[in-house]
Amino acid sequence: SSKWEACCDRCACTKSIPPQCHCADIRLNSCHSACESCACTRSIPAKCRCFDITDFCYKPCSG
């Protein structure tokens, strides 16, 4: 699978309905392709994390 495809290994959801899920993965230089709210450190390489809240988890990246 493409490394740019949206995926997440460490996803956490609340038990509410609908659930509120977020991905805790740290990626180098960019967030996954579906991320709208991405924050990166200024280090080289940059460590980026997606802060989107969704009602689902993306499929795992490592498979």
Swiss-Prot record:
Chain positions of site Reactive bond for trypsin: 14-15
UniProt-listed InterPro entries: Bowman-Birk_prot_inh, Prot_inh_BBI
Family matches, as Gene3D superfamilies: Cysteine Protease (Bromelain) Inhibitor, subunit H
Disulfide bonds: 7-61, 8-23, 11-57, 13-21, 31-38, 35-50, 40-48
GO cellular component, one term: extracellular region
Tagged with keyword Cytoplasm: no
Keyword Transmembrane helix included in the entry's annotation: no
Pfam families in the cross-refs: Bowman-Birk_leg
Site description Reactive bond for chymotrypsin, residues in chain: 41-42
Domain of life: Eukaryota
Keyword line: Disulfide bond, Protease inhibitor, Serine protease inhibitor
Transmembrane segments: none
SUPFAM superfamilies in UniProt: Bowman-Birk inhibitor, BBI (SSF57247)
CDD domains: BBI
Molecular-function GO term, any one: serine-type endopeptidase inhibitor activity
Protein purpose: Inhibits trypsin, chymotrypsin, plasmin and factor XIIa. Does not inhibit factor Xa, thrombin and plasma kallikrein.
Family, per entry: Belongs to the Bowman-Birk serine protease inhibitor family.
Descriptive protein name: Bowman-birk type proteinase inhibitor
